[in-house]
Amino acid sequence: MAATADSAKSLGLAACVAVVVGNMVGSGFYLSPAAVAPSGLLAVVMWIVMGVGAICLGLSFARLATLAPATGGPYAYARMAYGDFAGFLIAWGYWISVWASLPAIAFAFAGALMNLLPALNNKAMALALTLGAIWAVVGINLRGVKAAGLFAEVTTYAKLLPFGAIALVGLFYVRAENLSEFNPSGEPLLSAAAALAPLTMFAYLGLESATVPAGDVRDAQRTIPRSTLIGIAIAAALYVLGTVVVLGVVPRDQLLGSVAPFADAARLMWGEGAALAVALAVIVSSIGALNGWTLLMGQVPMAAAQDKLFPGAFGRVSARGVPALGIVISAALATLLVAFQASGSPGVRAFYNLLVSLSTMTAVVPYAFCALALPLVAAWRGQRGPGAPRLGVVELIAFAFSLFTIYGCGPEAVLYGLTLLLLGLPVFVWQRRQARKEEAC
C-alpha cells in the first residue's frame, strides 16, 4: 500500500530539479548583470561566495528533508523545531516573500516581451502583460500539482540551452580589458560586498523549493536532497559563468543602462538572431519562474492552515488536489502590488529593486531559522542522545550567510520586512483563539 501511495505522487526527480532550477533561474539571473555591473569583478566573487552559502543552505534543507519530509518546507521545519508561534512567523514571512516576488518576475517578463516586440512598448500594455502572466500561471496551477510540475520541466529545460550556451561558449568571447577592475565603485570592500548580497541572493531564492511540496514527491527522503543539490549546482554554474561572460563581453558603460544584458551579450557575439533566441528564452524563463513560485505560494499557507495557524480558507483543497482559494488570494495580493506601481508612485526599476530587497529579507529569515533547526527537529522526531544529528560546519556557514544577507538588505528593507511580519501577529492571535474555541466544543 505504501508503494502504491508513493507511486501515485506527482513529482519525481526531474520535476523537482526543474522546480528548483526554474525558481532560481528567473528574473534575478538575467537582470542581475546590469544591477551588479558597477561592482566589477567583485560581483563574480560574490556570486561564488553566495553560491557556497546557498549550497550550505541546500545541504541543511536536504538533511532536514531526509530526517522529516513534510509539506510546507521551511514552515514545517520551523514549527517542529521552535513551536507554533515561530512556525507561524516563518510561514507568514515566507508566504509574503513568494507573492511579493511575483510582480518582480512578471515585470521582467513584460519587459522582455516588449523588448522583443517594440510595438507593445507602452504603459497600458506593460500592465496587461504583467497581470496576464500572473493569472495565466495561476490558471495552470489550479489544474493540479502534476500540471504545474510538467510545465516546470518544459520551461526549465527549454531555457537551459540558450543560457548554457552563453555561459560556456561565451567564455571564448570575453575581453580581458572589460574585467580589469575589481571594485570600481570605490566603496569599502565589506560595504560593497554587503550591497551585492541581496541582489545575488534574490537569484538564489528558491533553493528550498523541492522541500515545500514534499507530500507530492515520490521517494521524498531521497528525491528532495538530490534535486536540491543538483538544482543549486546548475544555477550556481550558470550565475558565475554567465556573469563573467556578460561583464567580459558588454562594455561597462553599455551594461550599466541595459535592460536585457544577456540579449546584448548574445547580439555582440553572434548577431541579432542570437539576441532574439535569448529574448525568447528570457520570456520562457520568466513564465517558468512564475509557475514554480505560484506552486509554492499555495503549499506553504496550506500546510499552516491544516495546522490551524493560518485561516482555514488557505487549507481548502479543490477536486484537483490544489489549495485553489489560497493561490487566488495570494495572486490577488500580488495584483495589488502591480496596481500600486501602475498608479505612478515608484518607477518600475525602483519598484523592482524594492521588491527584490523585500522578498530577499522575508525569505532569508526563514533560512536562518532552518539552518539551526536540525538538532531540534531530530529531538522532535525522538532522536536524542550521542547518536542524534547535530549542527555541523555546513549549518553554521548557512546561518552566517543568512545573517550577512539580512545585513546587506539595508535598514529600509529590514524595517519593511519586520513590519510585514508584525502585521501577522493579529492573525496568529485570532487563529489560536479560534482553535481553542473548537477544542472547547
Q: At which residue positions do the language-model features occur?
A:
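Membrane-helix boundary/coupling elements in multi-pass transport proteins
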Residues: 30, 70, 93-108, 204, ...
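TM-loop-TM module centered on a large, flexible mid-protein loop between adjacent transmembrane helices
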Residues: 76-77, 83, 114-119, 229-294, ...
